[in-house]
Amino acid sequence: MGKGTPSFGKRHNKSHTLCNRCGRRSFHVQKKTCSSCGYPSAKTRSHNWAAKAKRRHTTGTGRMRYLKHVSRRFKNGFQTGSAKATSA
């Protein structure tokens, strides 16, 4: 048997499993690194030659729980909870 089509039927071991950070099935079991996000390294994996991949994972593609309110708060000067005392 050669290395072509017939031998592909014998492959049944998983080399990648689910990643704890990005959730994709890209975490290499033996290398212990994610091919998608680069986990466990502190910085998320990103390359300039993968422009489409950057577009998919960049800021603004998720919920942005905190960041979506920052522009409005900036416009008002980051006011705190206490109201200003009115001079009468």
UniProtKB/Swiss-Prot annotation:
GO terms for molecular function: RNA binding; rRNA binding; structural constituent of ribosome; zinc ion binding. It is found in: Cytoplasm. The gene is RPL37B. It comes from Saccharomyces cerevisiae (strain ATCC 204508 / S288c) (Baker's yeast). Zn(2+) binds at residues 19, 22, 34, 37. Binds 1 zinc ion per subunit. Component of the ribosome, a large ribonucleoprotein complex responsible for the synthesis of proteins in the cell. The small ribosomal subunit (SSU) binds messenger RNAs (mRNAs) and translates the encoded message by selecting cognate aminoacyl-transfer RNA (tRNA) molecules. The large subunit (LSU) contains the ribosomal catalytic site termed the peptidyl transferase center (PTC), which catalyzes the formation of peptide bonds, thereby polymerizing the amino acids delivered by tRNAs into a polypeptide chain. Residues 37-57 are annotated as: Disordered. This is Large ribosomal subunit protein eL37B. Keywords: Cytoplasm, Metal-binding, Ribonucleoprotein, Ribosomal protein, RNA-binding, rRNA-binding, Zinc, Zinc-finger. One of its GO terms (cellular component) is cytosolic large ribosomal subunit. A zinc finger (C4-type) spans 19-37.
